[in-house]
Amino acid sequence: MAHKKAGGSTKNGRDSESKRLGVKRFGGESVLAGNIIVRQRGTRFHAGDNMGIGKDHTLFALKDGKVQFDVKGPKNRKFVSIVAE
């Protein structure tokens, strides 16, 4: 009788799905209120004028306008704002 010995087990073979994080609307782009601008873990980008922040730190537009990125403050923090057109 032909037999094949059982193969060993492996500890590999798992991976998590990518979360599609990052900047979704770039500087100078026109956006509508409610559009998501940045999806992030933690506050890599901070909310500036006319921006809201979700419980998962997602930044979104509160008003229609253009996206503007700035670096401000003594800690050189990155801020995202919406400038009215």
From Swiss-Prot:
One of its GO terms (biological process) is translation. The keyword Ribosomal protein applies. GO terms for cellular component: cytosolic large ribosomal subunit. Coiled coil: none annotated. Transmembrane segments: none annotated. It holds the Pfam family Ribosomal_L27. Keywords: Ribonucleoprotein, Ribosomal protein. One of its GO terms (molecular function) is structural constituent of ribosome. Belongs to the bacterial ribosomal protein bL27 family. HAMAP family: Ribosomal_bL27 (MF_00539). This is Large ribosomal subunit protein bL27. It comes from Alteromonas mediterranea (strain DSM 17117 / CIP 110805 / LMG 28347 / Deep ecotype). The lineage of its organism: Bacteria, Pseudomonadati, Pseudomonadota, Gammaproteobacteria, Alteromonadales. The gene is rpmA.
